[in-house]
Regions:
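Conserved, structured core segments of small domains
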Residues: 1-141
């Protein structure tokens, strides 16, 4: 099972404040553990929303772009991981070991399971499955 681990933004990450060397060292060590355990597929930190944009698609077909920053930090992300684990419980166990909290003293991490091809059932036709497998092969290099 694959999970996306979402590190929620706070006022410090949204202000562009960088973690200190101690936290970066701890996070690097934790990432090494994830990699050695075969758990980490990928992950990145994100710039503040002030450097981003949102694209809204309306029912009428219109497209509206809103540049950041965005006010509701509880809805924003500061980073993410993609992990391959056996269960949600295993993902939770790993999340409990994340070097936290960040600068603000509190942190929130969300765990979301990623859809796999089999999750789509009958709508995943052989043609769609072949397309998906081909795309994944190209992405894997």
């Amino acid at each position: 099972m694959r999970f996306m681990i979402l590190l929620k933004a706070d006022k410090h990450s949204e202000a562009g404040e960088m973690p200190d060397e101690t936290l970066l060292t701890a996070m690097g060590k934790f990432n090494d553990e994830l990699i050695q355990a075969g758990v980490m597929v990928g992950g990145e930190g994100l710039h503040p929303s002030s450097r981003g944009a949102r694209v809204h698609f309306g029912k009428d077909g219109g497209v509206r772009v809103t540049d950041g920053p965005f006010a509701e930090t509880k809805e924003l992300l500061a980073g993410f991981w993609i992990w391959q684990v056996k269960s949600k419980e295993e993902a939770i166990a790993w999340v409990k070991r994340v070097p936290m909290p960040m600068l603000g003293g509190e942190a929130e991490i969300e765990i979301r399971q990623i859809f796999e091809m089999d999750d789509f059932g009958e709508v995943m036709t052989p043609e769609l499955r072949e397309q998906e497998e081909r795309q994944r092969a190209v992405l894997a290099g």
